[in-house]
Amino acid sequence: MALFEIIISLFVVYIIHNAISKYKKIHVNELCGPTPIPILGNLHQFGELPHRVLTKMTKKYGHILRVYMADMYTVVVSDPLLIREMYVDNSDIFTDRVKKPSVEHGTFYHGTVTSYGEHWKNNREIVGKAMRKTNLKHIYELLDKQVDVLIRSMKSIETSGKTFDTRYYITKFTMSAMFKFLFNHDIPEDEDINKGDTQKLMGPMSEVFQNAGRGSLFDVINITQPLYLLYLEMFDQSFKDIMKYHREKYNEHLKTFDPDVERDLLDILIKEYGTDNDDKILSILATINDFFLAGVDTSSTALESMVLMLTNYPEIQEKAFDEIKTVVNGRSKVNLSDRQSTPYLVAVIKETLRYKPMSPFGLPRSSSKDCMIGGHFIPKNAQILINYQALGMNEEYYENPEQFDPSRFLKVESNVAFLPFSIGIRSCVGQSFAQDELYICISNILLNFKLKSIDGKKIDETEEYGLTLKTKNRFNVTLEKRII
């Protein structure tokens, strides 16, 4: 009985201490936000679509606000000028990633995405150099080949009278492009990505995305973090399987590695990092993992959204097709060199990324010290999130933001609020590759097919919350061959 009373007393003391830490005033210019509760903070208010709840909160608290994700003081920002002030003007303060068990377990803070401090600076320099050394002609040929495979599959589906499983084939396209870019590996055209060799990687990667999308309360409660890390190390197999797969590819490359012949990004990383200690090898493996986790699902989400919006807005689809048809002038394929001649299609891509962001918040950053941003106090170790939904719906920068209207991007050369790949020195390192991938894929789909919903009605655009914002319900579309 005495032990039970002690436990209850300690719990009560913890609750009181936790509440005081959240309620106390930290600065005269501290951020406003909803009232938190002990332990949970504001998590109980987020619902199924936290990014939309936080977007609604901007009406009351403005485009920079404070919430508590359990014990984690979090700054949510959707004002592009404040984002620039943080990530560009004060990049030395807002470069680091957030430290928590799920990140440490999966990456050991190596690679380019989750590392921080001097380790990140070194990785960024090496990976940046590796990306610059990547042969552009090789990338163009790589993407062209993968588009050819996709279009052949779509033609076969159209001829058979079946419907097009958007998520499956788009994911296979982005995954095949990444396999070729990283490993110089061709996924067989008839291979089911849910089976065979690719499933060894895609299976555990799907689990990682599902788990990360759901999140864990223990990841953001200070007192439980050490135990949660131990739990992950003991029982979570997904990241171990992923790293095992990457190590197998790494070992295969070492057997045939020639420093004078750079076959893919892995070869370049081996050459740039070296292989003389375990830390360098881990950085190589973590970087490869970064490209897969950050590149495959985000690009497939964006392309799936483009198919969705073009199907739901046939008049926009026809206008984009007419532009493409005029530019190719009888050719059977759109090339990357056609991009400058297709401003409306580029506007469609941009509008889709604004209207249907790839990710709710991108990758969180952390403040390395107390600072003032836009007259607001940001404490040390605050988690920083960009709310891309609220950013894209910010009425100060977008007229009638609830409307899907690509022409808004034709009226001005650029919009300071358009930041789908973030901004500053820690923006997406694969941005150029992703932009090429999105353009070459959707342009050739439009050139070859008219996209229609199966029942003639609009497809449900509701998204499902996760690391990326895919549609809640998978959808197929009907393909109608274009006459060009």
Curated annotation (Swiss-Prot):
Coarse class of the protein's main subcellular location: membrane
Topological type in the membrane: Single-pass membrane protein
Residues holding heme: C428
UniProt enzyme class: oxidoreductase
InterPro entries assigned to the protein according to its UniProt record, in alphabetical order: Cyt_P450, Cyt_P450_CS, Cyt_P450_E_grp-I, Cyt_P450_sf
Swiss-Prot/TrEMBL cofactor(s): heme
Alphabetized CDD domains for the sequence: CYP1_2-like
Keywords in alphabetical order: Heme, Iron, Membrane, Metal-binding, Monooxygenase, Oxidoreductase, Transmembrane, Transmembrane helix
GO MF, one example: heme binding
Protein's cellular compartments: Membrane
The protein's Enzyme Commission number: 1.14.-.-
Annotated GO CC locations: membrane
Coiled-coil zones: none
Membrane-crossing residue ranges in chain numbering: 1-21
Superkingdom: Eukaryota
Family: Belongs to the cytochrome P450 family.
Protein name: Probable cytochrome P450 508A1
Upper taxonomic lineage: Eukaryota, Amoebozoa, Evosea, Eumycetozoa, Dictyostelia
Name of the encoding gene: cyp508A1-1
